[in-house]
């Protein structure tokens, strides 16, 4: 009887872990599970929010995903950049300052055999510096710690450092209650609320 109870408890735990797993939700890697942190220090974008976001991109901004060079800021597990690669993006650069995050990124990239299509940078996303020899990026994700206006700082840093193509699409995930303080050179194209989270799609204002 004890063994049966233990087996049921183990099965229930396995089901709970499977339901809590973070997966790629579309494209060629659909259904693949990502390695995620054992603590709350890194907060991956939920599957539901990510699916909703990429549905918007697929319907309204498909040209910004397919063949894109992607910059994933505050990358954590890399869920957003890897989702973009799964859906046809050409290359993704992940910016992650923490040791844990970079370890998770390496594991996920290797699991998907994407070493030739990715780069991991150890640096502060709010102080990117000059892009250097890298090509500018077409699609930029920022999922920073909530409520600290770090996404806006990171976008400004990317602009000042030459990381953005003039028509790049920027995606910011933030707490729905957080105030937005964008540099005047950016404009919000669209925003969607998902519970306590808000997703904003942003571009540079047209010159002139």
Where are these regions (language model features)?
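Class I S-adenosyl-L-methionine-dependent methyltransferase catalytic core
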Residues: 1-208
């Amino acid at each position: 009887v004890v063994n049966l109870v233990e087996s049921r408890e183990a099965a229930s735990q396995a089901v709970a872990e499977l339901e809590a797993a973070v997966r790629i939700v579309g494209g060629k890697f659909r259904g693949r599970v990502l390695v995620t942190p054992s603590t709350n220090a890194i907060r991956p974008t939920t599957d539901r929010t990510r699916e909703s976001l990429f549905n918007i991109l697929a319907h309204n901004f498909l040209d910004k995903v397919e063949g894109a060079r992607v910059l994933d800021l505050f990358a954590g597990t890399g869920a957003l950049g890897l989702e973009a690669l799964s859906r046809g993006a050409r290359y993704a650069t992940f910016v992650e300052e923490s040791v844990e995050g970079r370890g998770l990124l390496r594991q996920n990239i290797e699991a998907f055999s994407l070493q030739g299509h990715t780069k991991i940078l150890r640096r502060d996303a709010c102080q990117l510096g000059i892009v250097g020899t890298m090509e500018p990026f077409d699609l930029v994700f920022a999922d920073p710690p909530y409520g600290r206006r770090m996404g806006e700082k990171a976008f400004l840093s990317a602009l000042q450092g030459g990381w953005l193509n003039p028509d790049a699409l920027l995606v910011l995930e933030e707490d729905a209650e957080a105030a937005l303080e964008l540099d005047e050179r950016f404009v919000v194209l669209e925003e969607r609320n998902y519970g306590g989270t808000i997703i904003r799609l942003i571009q540079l204002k047209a010159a002139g």
